[in-house]
Amino acid sequence: MLIPKRVKFRRQHRPNRSGMSKGGNRVTFGDYGLQALEPTYITNRQIEAARIAINRHIKRGGKVWINIFPDRPLTQKPLGVRMGSGKGPVEKWVANVKPGRILFEMSYPDEQAAMEALRRAGAKLPCKVRIVKKEDQF
């Protein structure tokens, strides 16, 4: 699972999800990318499930880059606890994703297999995504 090794503060405010992604919105490393179309939080478990879905489909001969990292803690108080008495413990780690952000990149010689692998990974994520090619961006 992806979590930060060390953080300066255990609990943070919730991040802003409005607006478009300012950076990380072009395919730079691989040939194909998975681009978010909606603002959302993506947890470390969802990132791992999408990575496994890609790797199971392509097996060998390709390379996968994960462009997001869950560096924001989300807290939650236990069920049945009354209001007050401080902020709850960290429940999960999330990556704040804005529309236009490239989540995963991959390079693979077979285009159809690469598209299918990214489609399967997109099914594991909580937002609408689209598949983009490197040559179609510019």
UniProtKB/Swiss-Prot annotation:
CDD domains: Ribosomal_L16_L10e. Keywords: Ribonucleoprotein, Ribosomal protein, RNA-binding, rRNA-binding, tRNA-binding. Pfam families: Ribosomal_L16 (PF00252). InterPro entries: Ribosomal_uL16 (IPR047873), Ribosomal_uL16_bact-type (IPR000114), Ribosomal_uL16_CS (IPR020798), Ribosomal_uL16_dom (IPR016180), Ribosomal_uL16_sf (IPR036920). One of its GO terms (biological process) is translation. GO terms for molecular function: rRNA binding; structural constituent of ribosome; tRNA binding. Residues 1-25 are annotated as: Disordered. Residues 1-16 have a biased composition (Basic residues). It comes from the Bacteria. The keyword Cell membrane does not apply. One of its GO terms (cellular component) is cytosolic large ribosomal subunit. The keyword Glycosyltransferase does not apply. HAMAP family: Ribosomal_uL16 (MF_01342). Part of the 50S ribosomal subunit. Binds 23S rRNA and is also seen to make contacts with the A and possibly P site tRNAs. Belongs to the universal ribosomal protein uL16 family. This is Large ribosomal subunit protein uL16. It comes from Corynebacterium urealyticum (strain ATCC 43042 / DSM 7109). The lineage of its organism: Bacteria, Bacillati, Actinomycetota, Actinomycetes, Mycobacteriales.
